[in-house]
Regions:
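ABC ATP-binding cassette signature C-motif
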Residues: 1-177
């Protein structure tokens, strides 16, 4: 697994994955302190205010204000109980640690989400939740899976790699077959 700190709680581990959001939040706090300090001294803070506005816009655009709420929703969707959120990652089996890693990826919300056999180690409820998550995902998703029902529920295009050629088809996986 790619867990950064096995002794951290799963909620902290998942939230730590949102590195850019955390950087934007830290930078906003730094700028706020600088603006306060310089304005108390009567100095010009226009450039800092401009940067602060840009940082705040980026933070908001990335979902910084909803970070913890989104992390909790993703963890719950993948089968964790609220009481699990404060348990150390090390207490979970390999299958559950895979869910933690998947949660981290989903929280990062990349423009291109690459999923290799995402339904492995997931129960039916978690698979159904993941289907809904992918259906509402506002980026591109590339899925490699042997789970035909999952593919049918999630894809509207299929790329087939045969004889060193990629051919794309519009429709579900079953319609491709």
């Amino acid at each position: 697994t790619n867990l950064e700190q096995k002794d951290t709680t799963i909620l902290a581990e998942v939230m730590a994955a949102a590195k850019e959001i955390r950087r934007m939040g830290e930078r906003a706090n730094e700028l706020q302190a600088q603006i306060t300090e310089l304005s108390e001294k009567g100095k010009d803070v226009d450039a800092l205010l401009n940067e602060y506005g840009q940082v705040q816009d980026r933070f908001e655009h990335l979902g910084g204000y909803e970070l913890e709420s989104n992390a909790r929703k993703i963890l719950s969707g993948l089968g964790f109980k609220v009481t699990d959120f404060e348990r150390p990652c090390s207490e979970f089996s390999g299958g559950w640690q895979m869910r933690i890693s998947l949660s981290k990826l989903l929280l990062r919300h990349p423009d291109l989400l690459l999923l290799d056999e995402p339904t492995n180690h997931l129960d039916l409820e978690s698979v159904q939740w993941l289907r809904g998550f992918i259906a509402n995902y506002d980026g591109a998703v590339l899925i490699v899976s042997h789970d035909r029902a999952f593919m049918d529920a999630c894809v509207d295009h299929v790329a087939a790699l045969e004889n060193r050629r990629v051919t794309t088809y519009t429709g579900t996986y079953s319609s491709y077959l």
